[in-house]
C-alpha cells in the first residue's frame, strides 16, 4: 500500500536541563577561564589586557529580533522596555517605570534619560512606537505579531513617554515588552525582512557589532556607554559551529571558551580537569508540531491523540538526555501562565491503539495501521546539527512504530 507522506517536525516535548561548559583558570597553564581569555589590548599599552569570550554558536543569516522569535545574540545587542532579572521576574529595562490604568487598559512607559543607540543617536519613544507597529503590520510577516493583537493604539506622549491602549487586559503584556526595540532613524521606509540593517545591526545593548564574517564568526565589542555600565568582558566572539558534536570537540581543544551542550556531550566534561559545567533548568522544549497546512492532518485530526499517547516522554528523557530534563505538556511549563489542568496525554500505547481502531484503522500484514487503504505514517523532519533533536526524533519514531504507526 502507498504510504501517506508529509513533513512533520517530530520531537518529544520536554524542558531540557542543558549544560554550559568552559575551561577553568588555575587548573593548568593551558586552561582558559570560562568568562575570559586575556590578550594584549589593542592600545598596546603595557599592563593593559582585554578579555575575550569565544562562544560556540549556530549560524545566523540575519539579526532581526522584531521579525524572528529567537536568537541568542539579540540580548547582547538590543534591549526592551522591560527585562528579566536572575529569577525571571519582570523588571525595568529601557523604561525606568510604568503605570497601568485598569479602566482604559492602558500601559504608560517612562523611558530612562540618556539612552543612546550604538551610533550615538538619542533613543526616544518614537523608536518604541515604530518597532511595535512594524511587528503588528501583517505585511511584514513578523513571528512576534500574535503577542500584540490586543494593542489598539500606541501614543507617543513625548520623547520619553509612550502609551499602549489594549482592547482587553493581558497578563503577559509586560513580558511581551521585553521585545528588542529597533532604531526608527535607520529603518523607517526599509523592508523589515530584507533590509541591510539586519546584517549590520545598531542597538542599545551592552555590546555592539564590530564585524561579521559570514559562516565563520560574529564579533561584538562592549558598549562603553551602556546604561547599566560597560560590561566586564571586552569582546564576545560568536564562532559559528552549527554541529553540537563539533562544539564539544572545539571546547575540549580550547578553540571555544563556552558552549551550550546537550546532556550527552556535557557528560564528558563533568569530571574532566580544567572545565566547569553549569546545569541550567530552562524553558527550552522539544515538541511535536503538526503541520496543519497539509490537509493530511486536517482529514486525520481524530488520530492525533493516538500519536501523543504513543510517546513515552520519560523514557526519552532518560535515554537521550540522561535524565537531565522534565516531561512537558505544552510550551509553557515553568511560569505563571502554565495550566496544569490541560490534557497530558501520558504514555499509553493501548489507548493509542484504541483510538486508531475506533477511527476505522486496521493493521496490515506488516503490523502497521492503515486507513482507507493508506498506511498511517509520515516523514519525520528534524533540524540538522542538533544531536539531541535527532536522537529524540529517532526515539519517538521507534515508539510510534511499536504502537503501529509507521514513519
Language-model region placement:
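Gly/Pro-rich hinge or "lid" segments in bacterial periplasmic/extracellular proteins
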Residues: 85, 89, 178-231, 235, ...
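C-terminal motif of bacterial Sec signal peptides marking the signal peptidase cleavage site
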Residues: 17-20
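Surface-exposed binding/hinge segments that line
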Residues: 99, 103, 145-187
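Append "and occasionally in soluble cytosolic enzymes with long acidic Gly/Pro-rich linkers
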Residues: 299-398
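N-terminal lobe/hinge region of extracytoplasmic solute-binding protein
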Residues: 56-102, 133, 202
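Ligand-site clamp/hinge motif
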Residues: 223-269, 397, 404-407
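Short, well-ordered beta-strand elements
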Residues: 49-61, 96, 106-109, 128-131, ...
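Aromatic- and charge-enriched surface segment that lines or borders ligand/interaction sites
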Residues: 96-141, 163, 297
Amino acid at each position: 500500500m502507498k504510504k501517506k507522506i508529509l513533513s512533520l517536525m517530530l520531537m518529544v516535548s520536554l524542558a531540557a536541563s542543558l549544560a554550559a561548559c568552559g575551561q577553568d583558570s588555575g587548573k593548568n597553564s593551558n586552561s582558559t577561564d570560562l568568562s575570559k581569555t586575556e590578550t594584549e589590548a589593542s592600545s598596546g599599552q603595557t599592563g593593559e589586557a582585554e578579555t575575550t569570550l569565544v562562544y560556540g554558536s549556530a549560524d545566523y543569516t540575519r539579526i532581526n529580533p522584531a521579525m524572528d522569535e529567537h536568537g541568542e545574540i539579540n540580548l547582547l545587542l538590543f534591549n526592551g522596555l522591560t527585562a528579566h532579572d536572575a529569577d525571571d521576574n519582570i523588571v525595568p529595562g529601557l523604561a525606568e517605570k510604568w503605570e497601568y490604568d485598569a479602566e482604559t487598559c492602558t500601559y504608560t512607559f517612562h523611558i530612562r534619560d540618556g539612552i543612546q543607540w550604538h551610533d550615538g543617536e538619542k533613543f526616544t519613544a518614537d523608536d518604541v512606537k515604530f518597532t511595535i507597529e512594524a511587528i503588528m503590520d501583517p505585511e511584514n510577516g513578523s513571528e512576534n505579531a500574535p503577542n500584540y493583537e490586543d494593542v489598539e493604539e500606541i501614543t507617543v506622549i513625548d520623547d520619553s513617554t509612550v502609551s499602549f491602549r489594549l482592547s482587553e487586559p493581558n497578563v503577559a503584556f509586560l513580558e511581551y515588552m521585553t521585545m528588542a526595540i529597533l532604531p526608527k532613524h535607520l529603518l523607517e521606509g526599509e523592508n523589515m525582512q530584507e533590509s541591510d540593517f539586519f546584517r549590520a545591526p545598531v542597538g542599545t545593548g551592552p555590546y555592539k557589532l564590530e564585524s561579521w564574517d559570514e559562516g565563520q564568526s560574529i564579533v561584538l565589542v562592549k558598549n562603553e556607554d551602556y546604561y547599566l555600565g560597560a560590561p566586564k568582558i571586552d569582546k564576545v566572539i560568536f564562532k559559528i559551529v552549527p554541529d553540537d558534536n563539533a562544539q564539544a570537540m572545539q571546547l575540549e581543544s580550547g578553540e571555544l571558551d563556552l558552549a551550550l551542550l546537550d546532556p550527552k556531550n556535557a557528560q564528558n566534561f563533568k569530571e574532566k580537569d580544567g572545565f566547569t559545567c553549569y546545569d541550567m533548568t530552562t524553558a527550552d522544549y522539544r515538541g511535536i508540531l503538526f503541520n496543519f497546512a497539509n490537509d493530511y492532518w486536517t482529514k486525520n485530526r481524530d488520530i492525533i491523540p493516538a500519536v501523543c499517547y504513543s510517546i513515552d516522554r520519560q523514557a526519552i528523557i532518560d535515554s537521550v538526555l540522561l535524565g537531565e530534563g522534565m516531561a512537558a505538556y505544552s510550551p509553557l511549563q515553568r511560569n505563571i501562565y502554565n495550566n496544569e489542568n490541560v490534557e497530558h496525554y501520558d504514555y499509553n500505547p493501548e489507548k493509542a491503539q484504541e483510538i486508531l481502531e475506533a477511527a476505522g484503522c486496521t493493521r496490515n500484514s506488516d503490523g502497521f495501521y492503515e486507513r482507507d487503504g493508506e498506511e498511517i505514517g509520515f516523514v519525520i523532519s528534524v533540524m540538522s546539527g542538533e544531536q539531541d533533536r535527532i536522537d529524540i526524533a529517532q526515539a519517538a519514531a521507534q515508539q510510534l512504530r511499536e504502537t503501529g504507526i509507521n514513519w
